[in-house]
Amino acid sequence: MQNVHKRVIKDINDGMKNLKQEFGIYLAPEEDDFYKVHFILQGPEGTPFEGGLYHGMIRLNNDHPFRPPNLHMITPSGRFEAEKYPISPNSRGICTTATSFHPESWTSMNNLETVLKGFVSLMCDPYDGGVGAVKSTDTQVKKLAQDSLTHIGNDLMVQKLFPDLYKAVNNGTFKPVKLAELSKIVYKEPTKPIVEEKSAKTSKSSTKTSVKSKKNQKSDSEEEENSDDDNTDSDSESDDFRDLDDVVDDSDQESDDESDSSSESENESGGSDDESDDGSDDESDDETSESDSESEEEKPVKKSTRKISKTTTKSSSTKPVKSIKSSKSTTTKPTKPTKSTKTTKSTKSTKSTKSTKPTESTKSSRSVKTTESSKSSKSSKSSKTGKK
């Protein structure tokens, strides 16, 4: 079985239907080779070919519709050369703009209908010569038109491919069909329901777009509400942190007051110690005791600062407002050790005052005592000399 391209079958089916209705042209392919398509033309009205029947063949290329076909005439017409069937494969047939003689004018949009329509118009123009064309008088053409019926009645390919036409010709019942009586191809125009369907589709699409827009508006409003909630949460967190800062500031002020009172008491105690004769020994003992107390105080300060840092990290990581409020209660308790942190700073400053001021006073007191003793010794010596 021969492999036939879909385009070949389509062109044959379209040609068999449309050409017969419009021009009275019969069309049929060979059973063994669909690339050999036979046709029978009726002589056009008002021409010397009127009343005649003309058998021909179109040989399609294997790569149809990308290359033009060849066209051959089998029935003598007085206009083109006639060939005997079977036609030689080396024959190029008749020269037309739609055959292999002019491949530059061929396009893949051409089909069997365009080839045969062009051939009919060329047949009616006796002055257009070319390869395969024959010059004949009108009387010769008319005589060949009458003889064409007997030729068709003896053609075996016509009997095989067009049996109804073959019987009508041999029985004498064949009547040529006038082109004016042939029904034209009716092209269907779009009806109103199609327009209504289109409008319905457009309305559906518009409703879909409106639904999408509503969904987008809802999503936008939800996003705005979520952003507002986040802002309120952040504001509440910032307020809570501000409250914590206020608590820490209050504790700092209390620690400063206590440090001032402790410094005054230490200054008084330092002054009483400096008036004693063993000031130097007491000062060394005080310094050692103070250094020991400072070292002891610094240890809990470090621990307390670590606790505060942990509590602050916990409060920053928690987003809900309730958890932040609970962090307040936890952070207020470790604020007490912060007093010791700032008292240590104040003790350092007081240390310098202790080490400087008492030493000067002691030195001055000692110098005063020495001067007084020296003066008393001198006065005693002078009194002794006076007595002598």
UniProtKB/Swiss-Prot annotation:
InterPro entries: Ub_conjugating_enzyme, UBQ-conjugat_E2_core, UBQ-conjugating_enzyme/RWD. One of its GO terms (molecular function) is ATP binding. Transmembrane segments: none annotated. GO terms for biological process: protein ubiquitination. Signal peptide: none annotated. This is Probable ubiquitin-conjugating enzyme E2 L709. Pathway: Protein modification; protein ubiquitination. Residues 221-238, 246-297 have a biased composition (Acidic residues). The active site is at residue 95. Keywords: ATP-binding, Nucleotide-binding, Transferase, Ubl conjugation pathway. It catalyses: S-ubiquitinyl-[E1 ubiquitin-activating enzyme]-L-cysteine + [E2 ubiquitin-conjugating enzyme]-L-cysteine = [E1 ubiquitin-activating enzyme]-L-cysteine + S-ubiquitinyl-[E2 ubiquitin-conjugating enzyme]-L-cysteine. Residues 310-388 have a biased composition (Low complexity). Pfam families: UQ_con. Catalyzes the covalent attachment of ubiquitin to other proteins. Its EC number is 2.3.2.23. SMART domains: UBCc. The keyword Transferase applies. Residues 3-162 form the UBC core domain. Residues 195-388 are annotated as: Disordered. It comes from the Viruses. It is an enzyme of class 2 (transferase).
